[in-house]
Curated annotation (Swiss-Prot):
Cu cation binds at H67, H69, H92, H147. This is Superoxide dismutase [Cu-Zn] 2. Monomer. Zn(2+) binds at H92, H101, H109, D112. It comes from Salmonella typhimurium (strain LT2 / SGSC1412 / ATCC 700720). The keyword Cell cycle does not apply. Belongs to the Cu-Zn superoxide dismutase family. Disulfide bonds join C74-C169. Gene3D superfamilies: Superoxide dismutase, copper/zinc binding domain.
Length: 173
């Protein structure tokens, strides 16, 4: 009986030690609305920060800006009198109101993630880690965004790393 009890305690302890994980469905976005799925990104809590593992297809090859945005919506919204893709997601997650784009290692936006790398076949599968984000609770009900073009992790020479328009989006539940 003692062995059975010890086995149950060990099993429960191991189950409780399992890190949290969330799968985010990613969809193309346009000024008209949310489009087709291009795959998923799995977010895992790790000792080194939140790890984002993409399982994505149909993306333009190269580097893309990759961010957590403040609002949990991928819908278009009006900006300067025009409908803009996924504008309802708001800006980069910045709970400290730093107003700075300094990348995942810097002290600016908390939503700044490492760039997403897409191979020549349009597939993204390389995980990236955001060391300043420790818990899924920090990103719950926020939007995960892929931008057209790269990100130099600076506000110079262009604001927000020079990334382009919003290309794909998913809501973190």
């Amino acid at each position: 009986m003692k062995r059975l009890s010890l086995a149950m305690v060990t099993l429960l302890a191991c189950a409780g030690a399992q890190a949290a994980s969330e799968k985010v469905e990613m969809n193309l976005v346009t000024a008209q609305g949310v489009g087709q799925s291009i795959g998923t990104v799995v977010i895992d809590e790790t000792e080194g920060g939140l790890k984002f593992t993409p399982h994505l297809k149909a993306l333009p090859p190269g580097e893309h800006g990759f961010h957590i945005h403040a609002n949990g919506s991928c819908q278009p919204a009006i900006k300067d009198g025009k409908a803009v893709a996924a504008e309802a997601a708001g800006g980069h997650l910045d709970p400290q109101n730093t107003g700075k784009h300094e990348g995942p290692e810097g002290q600016g936006h908390l939503g700044d993630l490492p760039v997403l790398v897409v191979n020549n076949d349009g597939i993204a599968s390389e995980p990236v880690t955001a060391p300043r984000l420790k818990s899924l609770d920090e990103v719950k009900d926020k939007a995960l965004m892929i931008h057209v073009g790269g990100d130099n992790m600076s506000d110079q020479p262009k604001p927000l790393g020079g990334g382009g328009m919003r290309y794909a989006c998913g809501v973190i539940k």
